[in-house]
Amino acid sequence: EAVRKRAEEVGALVIVDEAYHYFYSKTFLKEALAVPNVVVLRTFSKLMSLAAVRLGVIIGNPELIGYVRNARLTFDANSIALLFAERLMNRPDVIDGLIRTQQEGKDGLLAELDKMGYWCRDCRGNFIFIKPRHNAHEVSDRLEKMNVLVHPYGNQLLKDFIRVSTGSKTAMSTT
């Protein structure tokens, strides 16, 4: 609220990235629809594991949306991606099923890692942070040789952790 008010005072735009909105129930949609300087960005790629689709939505004041529309490329999304999104938005049962499947896989992985004594952080997305027992970059390199891709970090706050993307129980148990 304080950020929104300050942005309004100075005429700035507040952009809320809700890329992981399927995994976290709090949203700024009401603000984006009611407050002229707030927009929400969402993507379809996180829940569907379709990063290559590169399709998302922007929700906000019609005037701001108009500026975005004027600045975008003529063919900024392919027709298959648009059809996919349109059909998906009309199938909340499919979305709910994907959320459930994703959560079951994440919960199973967290339970197994807890049994093995690892410190993990359940994040509000399709990933978790794990503190490995050895250097995070070395662990990442060893896992990559086994065709398991995780993401180590270089910054001071996260250098001791690896980020592991999560999926269905089947996907999480094949490694």
Predicted region positions:
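Active-site pre-lysine segment of PLP-dependent enzymes
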Residues: 1-47
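PLP-dependent enzyme catalytic core of the Aspartate aminotransferase-like
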Residues: 5, 142-151, 155-175
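PLP-dependent aminotransferase class I/II
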Residues: 37-114, 118-121
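Short acidic/glycine-enriched loop/turn segments that link adjacent beta-strands
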Residues: 52, 124, 157-160
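Short beta-strand-to-loop capping motifs
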Residues: 60, 130-134, 166-168
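Conserved PLP-binding catalytic core of the aspartate aminotransferase-like
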Residues: 103, 112-146, 162
